[in-house]
Amino acid sequence: MIDVKISDQIREKVPAYKVVVIEADIKNPATSDELWHEIQEASRRLRESIEMEQVNKRPAIKATREAYKALGKEPNRYRPSAEALNRRCVKGLELYRSLSVIDLVNLVSIESGHSIGAFDRDAVAGDMIELGVGEEGEPYEAIGRGALNIACLPVFRDAIGGIGTPTSDNDRTKLSETTKKLLITLNIYGSGEMNDEAVTERLMALLIKYASARNIMKSVYRADCAE
C-alpha cells in the first residue's frame, strides 16, 4: 500500500488533521440511475435542512476552512470542494453527473462535509505521497479549471508534484472510465456530524456497490502522531 507522510508544516499548523487512505481495484462506469437517485436525495435532504449561511458552519467544512486560515489561505476565494458542492445543493442547482467513483465520492462529501481526494493510482508517481503546503508559483492544473494557485493550500504531492488539494484534484491523476486502481484520501480536518469510522464505512460500502471494489486496503495517518 502507498506510504503517506505528513510534513512538519501541517503537523504544526493543523495538528487535528487525519487522513484515511483507501486503495482498491475498481471498475468506474458511468453513474447508474440508482446512484444518481441517492445523490439527488442527499442533495434534497441537505437543501431542506440548512440555509446557505449555515453551509460553512457544518463542522467538517468549518474545520477545513480553519485549516486554510491557519496556513494563510482565504477559504472564501478557494473554497474546499465539499463546501462548494454543499452550496450547490442548497442553492438547488443541478449537479454534474459523471462516473461512478467521482459521484459516490461527491455523495459522501454531501453527507459528511469532508473534502475527499480520488486518484488513478496508476497515474500517481512512486510509492509515497506527502501532505505539505503549496508554494508560491508551484504549477498545478486543477480538474476542469486549469491553473490553480495552490500557495498556502494543503497539497498532497507524489514524486512529480501536486496531485490533490481540498479545493481541487490535479488533472494529471484524475479518474477516468479506464481507471482500474483507485487511491482515495479522506481528509478529516476536524470532527463532522458523522463520526470518522461511519464516513469510512459508508465510502467503502459505496465503492463495493457501485464500483465493484475488490482488494480494499485502508490505513489511517494523523498529524499529531509521530511516523
Model-flagged regions — what are they?
Residues 1-227:
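Charge-biased, low-complexity intrinsically disordered regions
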